[in-house]
């Protein structure tokens, strides 16, 4: 598969390297686990590498047949200049060109492959971490003329047409947070202030972290700096300028700023679909509520994947693309 146009920020990702954080390696991995797992379920390739597309997608020419699914909340995609559905397993023939256009709802989507991308793992993962230059395509985003190879696999045509309806997130801009490790280094007034104002995501935000801009600055009881310590995903650091930073997948493994809060797992899933200049608000939840929230998410995800495996949803218009193409040619010759 050859990259004709790379898109804004397209990287190879899988579930990441969380078990190597203790050794100083950033987690990396997909920003949205739900969309990632649904995408791989549609093409019957659990835990396989995907292309994570941010805002504006790539144009890719396939040099061998495959089945693909691009999963996102809303975008336009084309195969040989013809529109095709998102969130659906599509058969792509040798020589065909897939064009993923701008994502119109949300910020990220995932292109999954029935025949896996053939990339050598580093520390049990192929996930790209651009700051350290490891994983994926030599530790960088996709570039024009890059060639990605697939592993050998007999194509299972039965999965063509697998489809799934992705529901919009409820309260997509309301981010649940729990008390952070240095919660007590801030006054109760500051705790209230954090959830009583809205924040804008700065343009200086990326996979490492989202910098936020709010009207009222958060004040520390004593100092912003602490002795460096491990950083959990979703940690909300407050540096000396009083504007919070939410640390995400490509974060460093240790840091020396006070952490007023930690974004819940569901909150991080929401953040993955937000972009610069979007507004968010926080809401405090308990650790127990966060656990229930996560268990509900897992149960729903497992149900959704089971439904896909049982072929509960099928787009009949995409089951026999070759037959449709031949029929169209015959019809053209008869006219």
Residue spans for each PLM region:
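Conserved "landmark" site that anchors the functional core of diverse proteins
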Residues: 1-335
């Amino acid at each position: 598969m050859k990259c004709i146009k790379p898109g804004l920020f397209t990287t190879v990702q899988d579930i990441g390297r969380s078990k190597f954080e203790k050794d100083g390696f950033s987690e990396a991995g997909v920003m949205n686990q739900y969309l990632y797992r649904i995408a791989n379920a549609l093409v019957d390739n659990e835990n396989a590498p995907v292309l994570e597309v941010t805002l504006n997608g790539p144009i890719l020419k396939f040099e061998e047949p495959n089945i693909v699914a691009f999963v996102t909340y809303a975008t336009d995609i084309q195969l040989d200049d013809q529109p095709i559905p998102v969130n659906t397993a599509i058969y792509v023939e040798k020589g065909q060109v897939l064009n993923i256009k701008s994502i119109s709802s949300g910020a990220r989507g995932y292109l999954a492959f029935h025949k896996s991308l053939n990339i050598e793992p580093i520390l049990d993962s192929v996930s790209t971490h651009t700051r350290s230059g490891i994983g994926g395509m030599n530790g960088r985003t996709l570039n024009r003329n890059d060639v990605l190879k697939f592993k050998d696999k007999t194509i299972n045509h039965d999965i063509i047409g697998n489809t799934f309806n992705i529901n919009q997130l409820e309260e997509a801009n309301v981010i649940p947070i729990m008390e952070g490790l240095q919660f007590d280094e801030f006054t109760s007034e500051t705790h209230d202030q954090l959830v009583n104002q809205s924040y804008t995501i700065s343009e200086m935000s990326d996979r490492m972290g989202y910098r936020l801009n709010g009207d009222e600055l958060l004040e520390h009881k004593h100092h912003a700096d602490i002795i460096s310590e491990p950083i959990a995903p979703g940690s909300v650091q407050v540096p000396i300028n009083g504007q919070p930073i939410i640390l995400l997948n490509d974060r460093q493994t240790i840091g020396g700023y006070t952490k007023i809060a930690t974004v819940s797992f569901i909150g991080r899933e929401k953040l993955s679909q937000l972009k610069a200049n979007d507004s968010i608000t926080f809401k405090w939840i308990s650790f127990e509520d966060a656990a229930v929230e996560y268990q509900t998410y897992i149960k729903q995800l497992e149900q959704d994947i089971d439904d896909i495996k049982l072929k509960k949803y099928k787009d009949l218009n995409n089951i026999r693309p070759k037959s449709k193409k031949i029929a169209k040619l015959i019809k053209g010759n008869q006219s």
